[in-house]
Swiss-Prot record:
InterPro entries: Ribosomal_bS20, Ribosomal_bS20_sf. Binds directly to 16S ribosomal RNA. One of its GO terms (cellular component) is small ribosomal subunit. One of its GO terms (biological process) is translation. It comes from the Bacteria. It comes from Renibacterium salmoninarum (strain ATCC 33209 / DSM 20767 / JCM 11484 / NBRC 15589 / NCIMB 2235). Pfam families: Ribosomal_S20p. This is Small ribosomal subunit protein bS20.
C-alpha cells in the first residue's frame, strides 16, 4: 500500500481512468461489430449509418486519450473499406 499522499491520489485517479477506458473501449468494439454485422448481412443503409456512428465513437476515444489517433485511423479505414466494397 502506498504511504505517500500523492501516490494514494494517483491510485484513485488511475482506477477511475482504467474504468473509463474499459467502458469506452467496449463501446468501440460494439460499434465496430455493428458495422461488420451490417456488412455481412449485406444491408447497405444500416452499414452506412453504423459506419458514421463508429467513426464518431473512434474520434471521441482519440480526443479522450483512450486510443492513439493512428489506431483510430486504421480502424476507420478498415471498416470503411468493407462498407465501400459492399456499396461498390
Amino acid at each position: 500500500m502506498a504511504n505517500i499522499k500523492s501516490q494514494k491520489k494517483r491510485i484513485l485517479t488511475n482506477e477511475k481512468a482504467r474504468l473509463r477506458n474499459n467502458a469506452v473501449k467496449s463501446e468501440l468494439k460494439t460499434a465496430v461489430r455493428a458495422v461488420n454485422q451490417a456488412v455481412e448481412a449485406g444491408n447497405k443503409e444500416t452499414a452506412g449509418e453504423a459506419l458514421v456512428h463508429a467513426s464518431r465513437k473512434l474520434d471521441k476515444a482519440v480526443s479522450k486519450g483512450v486510443i492513439h489517433s493512428n489506431q483510430a485511423a486504421n480502424r476507420k479505414s478498415a471498416i470503411s473499406k468493407k462498407v465501400s466494397a459492399l456499396k461498390g
